UniProtKB/Swiss-Prot annotation:
Keywords: Isoprene biosynthesis, Lyase, Metal-binding. It is an enzyme of class 4 (lyase). Its EC number is 4.6.1.12. The record marks 34, 133 as: Transition state stabilizer. Coiled coil: none annotated. Transmembrane segments: none annotated. HAMAP family: IspF (MF_00107). This is 2-C-methyl-D-erythritol 2,4-cyclodiphosphate synthase. A divalent metal cation binds at residues 8, 10, 42. GO terms for molecular function: 2-C-methyl-D-erythritol 2,4-cyclodiphosphate synthase activity; metal ion binding.
Amino acid sequence: MRIGTGYDLHRLVKGRRLVLGGVALPFEKGLDGHSDADVLVHAVCDALLGAAGLGDIGDHFPDTDARFKGVSSLLLLTETGRMLKEKGFFVVNIDATVLAQAPKLGAHKAAMAANMATALGIDAACVNVKATTTEGLDAVGRGEAMAAMSVALIIEEEARDSRGQGAG
């Protein structure tokens, strides 16, 4: 059993679309970044990569690589899942929190979780998404940025098979 954590923060800017957990949200600003800047998916990728001892998102999908310009972060998550599977790991569960002053995200959390579960090929019940504000404090609270945190639990495939545990 291995546990990893992930964190990401991106600046909010006009002229970009807002994507969280692969869901395009109506909002006057979007997250600035090389890919679609989906902070939620980026935090989840980092948690999974860290749990597997595979470095971080920047090691595998650098913002200096033109192949990742504007790419959907769900594709990065799918590739992260493939890397874990190749190393013999299985995702047991993911718990993630988005920090955003606005917009309200409650109605979109299930879709975000479902998108990430689909990208990883696991049951949606194994992915939990929460949302909170920072009560007007810091860059997130001032509406200048959004952030996300994630924790992931993975096991080796042999452990899953022998104990009958795991998602899916």
